[in-house]
Design a protein with these regions (language model features):
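Active-site helical microenvironments for divalent-metal-assisted chemistry
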Residues: 1-201
Length: 201
């Protein structure tokens, strides 16, 4: 469905918009799902958005070849093998922006498989744990690394993830309650001293 592919492109642009990427990168991200599914031809893209955007889309597509390697989605693999795959990925592309678009595409995919069967979620999470989260870390893109790791942990360790999420929620409620009490006490003290001021938590 072209509309779903376009929606994925919009989501990728939204992910990248926080990184202050240039307009060609955002255009390539928006159009990549449509181009990858051959919904829009390369000739049409070249005429409408130019060669630079098409080259970026090519670079992202080339990175898909890495998925054929067992090291991308298995547990029984050494850190050296995984590191080799990451180096291969970086060597495959001439433009750093291709890697950033690919990271956004993987995040969009992780979001999409939230309600998919468990084996599909686990497969996507293993691939990102082995390859893409460390790649984001190596490139210094902490924002994307954090979201990749968050989804991976949620899918690979769901019970532990729910436990931690519950603890964080309880701590937030405790903190809000403490602030509310403190602000109330401060307002009362200021009123008693005749001080007119607004206090917010």
């Amino acid at each position: 469905d072209a509309s779903l592919l376009l929606w994925r492109g919009v989501e990728m642009v939204e992910i990248l918009s926080t990184l202050s990427m240039d307009i060609d990168t955002l255009r390539a991200a928006l159009l990549f799902p449509l181009a990858d599914a051959n919904v829009v031809s390369e000739d049409v893209l070249r005429e409408s958005v130019g060669k630079s955007v098409v080259n970026l889309i090519h670079g992202v597509r080339d990175m898909a070849a890495i998925r054929q390697l067992k090291a991308t989605h298995t547990d029984s693999v050494s850190s050296e093998q995984v590191d080799n795959v990451r180096r291969m990925l970086l060597a495959m592309v001439d433009d750093f922006r291709c890697v950033v678009i690919k990271l956004a595409e993987r995040i969009a995919h992780l979001r999409e498989v939230k309600d998919a069967p468990e084996d599909e979620r686990v497969l996507a999470a293993k691939e990102c744990t082995n390859i893409y989260a460390p790649l984001a870390n190596r490139l210094g893109i902490g924002q994307l690394k954090w979201e990749l790791e968050d989804y991976c942990f949620r899918y690979l360790h769901p019970t532990e993830y729910k436990r931690i999420a519950k603890l964080l929620h309880e701590r937030r409620l405790d903190r809000e309650h403490y602030i509310e009490e403190f602000v109330g006490h401060l307002r009362a003290e200021m009123k008693a001293e005749g001080v007119k001021a607004e206090v917010y938590g």
